[in-house]
Design a protein with these regions (language model features):
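Sequence-structural signature of mature extracellular/luminal beta-sheet repeat domains
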Residues: 1-302
Length: 302
């Protein structure tokens, strides 16, 4: 696929959000900041949450909502920036809210049901302004946390756990009819789907899991963040087999390659929603290309 690099020199970019003014907002996880990219090489730091800002989304209040994973230890390996274990200065995971006019960062929540969030990763709002988000957990020298899928009702102060005990929950998205939540699990290379009875209420797929498996990748491939298409396909960033894997609701999949081992996310924009912005994280680049199908327009934009 043909693409252009519109921004370089970023420190592990993730979470692209396409703004109405044509700019793209990303996080720089290693730099612990949120950056606006103008597409001509110009960048501007708009907020400094610290920790590890990760997934981003515009909320119903017009603010920028942030999954903050608390940070990683990074290694520079042959010119590639590689994230790893939980850092010594880790002070917990949290959901944050950024006022785009001032850059002020507020903590929305850091516990669910009395349990601390470990590494919130990605988030999506439904049309009513309810929030679904994942907790990826943290990795340590000899073990790692389990993670799960969570729900925060619009206007609520406390979230609830929808399902837990997943290896490494990452990207999350809603089907166009908002009857299904899709969740990528990193270490298993598996795409899960959670059917909803109503917002925040899942129909358990089995006595063992709330979700059902849509697809599992062959060989060693890791899933990262994702975006939905208007047709209901899942475009999930894929690590090691660097690129974007498109998965149909029925489980068929195909791969679009990009030149980075750690491709972490994709976002759609443009009048026809076929401009795709892809974060090439280990090389610190933001790429732009034309996608073969329109992306799903998000419920809230700014």
């Amino acid at each position: 696929m043909e693409f252009e690099i519109i921004t370089s020199g970023l420190r592990f970019p993730e979470g692209p959000v396409v703004m109405a003014d044509g700019s793209i907002i990303v996080v720089e996880i290693e730099k612990k900041c949120i950056t606006r990219c103008w597409g001509d090489g110009k960048t501007e730091v708009i907020a400094t949450p610290g920790g590890g800002p990760n997934g981003l989304a515009i909320g119903p209040d017009g603010a920028l909502w942030v999954c903050n994973n608390g940070g990683f230890i990074y290694t520079d390996m042959d010119g590639l920036l590689i994230p790893g274990n939980c850092p010594d200065d880790y002070d917990g995971g949290r959901i944050e809210r950024v006022d785009l006019s001032t850059g002020k960062v507020d903590r929305v929540l850091d516990t669910v049901g009395g349990h601390p969030l470990k590494g919130p990763n990605d988030l999506v709002f439904d049309k009513a302004g309810n929030l679904y988000f994942t907790d990826h957990g943290k990795t340590y020298s000899r073990h790692r946390d389990f993670g799960g899928l969570f729900f925060l009702a619009n206007g609520a102060s406390e979230a609830k756990e929808l399902d837990f005990h997943y290896s490494s929950p990452n990207g999350v998205g809603l089907a166009p009819d908002e009857q299904t939540v899709f969740m990528a699990d990193t270490m298993t290379g598996r795409m899960w789907a959670f059917d909803l009875e109503s917002p925040g209420i899942i129909k358990p797929a089995s006595p063992f899991n709330g979700g059902r498996v849509v697809a599992t990748m062959p060989g060693l491939q890791y899933f990262d963040s994702l975006a939905m298409t208007a047709a209901g396909n899942v475009c999930v960033a894929t690590i090691l087999n660097g690129g974007i894997t498109t998965i149909t609701p029925g489980g068929d999949f195909h791969h679009t390659a990009f030149p980075d081992l750690i491709v972490t996310n994709i976002a759609f924009g443009g009048d026809d929603m076929q401009d795709a912005y892809v974060t090439l994280s280990s090389t610190g680049q933001l790429a732009k290309c034309r996608w073969p199908e329109p992306g799903l327009k998000l419920n809230f934009n700014a």
